[in-house]
Amino acid sequence: MPNPVSSALIADRWAQGPSAGADPLDSLVYLSNLLGREQRLVQPGGGNTSIKLLLPTADGGSVEALLVKGSGTDLRTIRREGFTRLSLPKLGALRHADSMSDGDMMRFMAGCMLATGPAPSVETPLHSLLPHRVIAHTHDVATMSLTNVSDGVAERLVAELFQGRIVYVPYSRPGFPLAHAVSGMADRIPPTAIGMTLAHHGLVIFGDDARQCYARLVEVADRIEEYLATCRRARQVLGPARWSVPPPEERRRAAEVILPAVRGALGASDRVILHYDDAEELLTTLAAERTPELVRRGMTTPEHLLRAGRLPLWLELDPGAAEDATVAAVRSQIGRQRAEYEEYHRRYAAPEERALDDWAKVLLVPGVGMITAFGDKNSALTANLCYRAGLESLVNAEAVDRFQFLPEADVFEFEHWPLERRKVEETIAQERATRLLPRSVVIVIGGGSGIGLAAAGRFADAGAHVVVADLDAGATEKAVAGLAGRFPGRMIGVAVDVRDDSSLDALFRKTVLEFGGLDCLFYTAGLPPRFAPLTAIRREDLQRQLEVHYLGAVAAIGRAATIMRRQGRGGAIVASVSKAAVVPGKDAVAYAGSKAALLQALRVAAVELGPDGIRVNAINADQIETPLFLQFVRERAAGRGVTIEEQLETYRKRNLMGVGLIPPEAVADMAVLLASEKFRFTTGGYLTVDGGLPEAFPR
């Protein structure tokens, strides 16, 4: 499969690295970062490295220690503190154990730790039982291609390619079983060996130092890649094209309909965030005749079972079908494949063992692309990268001989591996306990400043993925830059003009293609009031206020509702109105009229969208400390011939609680609550954030 991940052999990139006399741990960090940045070698979060060192002890002595990549760290970004330090003499007891449960293994390793740090990696036993000083373990495309065939073929090819320098190890489950298996074949590993290929589990390379280990790894991976290239040239694996590859604009229009339907179908218990990939070479592979049959044979490494699922879903959709028919087809085909999954689950599950909610992480749609689903954008992107690497390995393995993954029973065991399922379940439980909007997608229109900017941060704090949209592109960019560091992968900015239908279309399209759908629209776009008596107001003043406060809002709500209906999981629409919507004010016909129109539109929307589970509510905020309100204060003060401070005092005195300027976060908090399950029975509502203005009380 043509793929940018494997477009060339791996280049040796050590040139700018530490010299031979550098600190050994610094050199290991550099090695790890090099591996982590090379997606042909390691996909995000995968792989592990280690070094054995003599460390000083508090009593002035020393201890032989294993420093190994800690659980939850990433080779691409790991630093010195990311390596767990363990006592090698204590770890040596593993040699004498015939079996060990995962729980016992983790407790044993915790007792071997020399200092606080990340929990030991599940591959720590393997690193500890191998005698070599520096070890690197990768899930590289080349090795996975070579070892996802029968044991007999894989072992023969490894022997032919490396003449004993690389040893083939049949599959054992990662953790203690793999370490025990390798320990048991120690007498078959010649002293000249520089590494091992692990069936379905990648490459392990040894070295005296980090530089040597890296050089050997590049050499081995490239030697395998050269062999694979000859196999690809000799055998046409995928066959002729069966499906067409539409132009980018056409397939993305289709994806706009398909993605929300997928998101709704997969998000029955917990919502998912989607990543969409329509790269040309990927679509060419999906269009091939044999691809559907090949991808149903499985993944290429247990690591990818965790990150990309057991099997991809395959959707065949009619490009000429109406939108409603496409949504129905997506739901039907996913439902059928869910039934197949449940049948597989019944074949191997214990009586009380539940089928997984996160059973499907990859969907392949010929003519459209690949969709990956996870609890957050970064994890969905990781699933994409893992499956891209796996798909290439699958095609390569078929060119070598015949692609063959693990037996179904082993796949089930790994999918339900308690050590990993516990992490997933704890993450979900923590999300539910601490976040009001986990895994949600929210658009904030007017998010560049004031209430909208505060809301963008509050929605993200609540667990949402947020699209910050504003007319001011610079403000949007600044808002995202200020928030993205706290919420990596969960914040994008889009410039939008709500007076322009094509601009609104682009905003909602970008949201769907980026995150897969939409759960909440918060509309807080606004213009400063244009004060003038009825006898002097101009038509263009009325139109300008209506365009933003009413017409733009209605257009945005309609687009949001369309996406939410495709998902079929309800949703929330919240808009910031104003006291002026219900309280007449002198010279405010343009502003008050537009806000009153917005409030009535929200009530109509609540009536129309309620049967779809879409809730629509309004917030009446007054004297909020925003640039827009402060401009309003200046204009009012000038019109009355008073100071700004005197004008603000007037506002303070008129509310029952006697509060001055209200922070925009107070409105943002209300918006988050209205969007959340806390208000799941509330629609058509009108809540105030104003300190108590009797004339603005809802009637």
Predicted regions and their residues:
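Substrate-binding pocket helix/loop in short-chain dehydrogenase/reductase
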Residues: 532-534, 538-543
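Short, small/polar-rich loop/turn modules that mediate ligand/substrate recognition or access, typified
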Residues: 610, 615, 682-684
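Active-site helix of classical SDR
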Residues: 557, 594, 602
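Alpha-helical segment proximal to the catalytic Tyr-Lys
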Residues: 562, 607-608
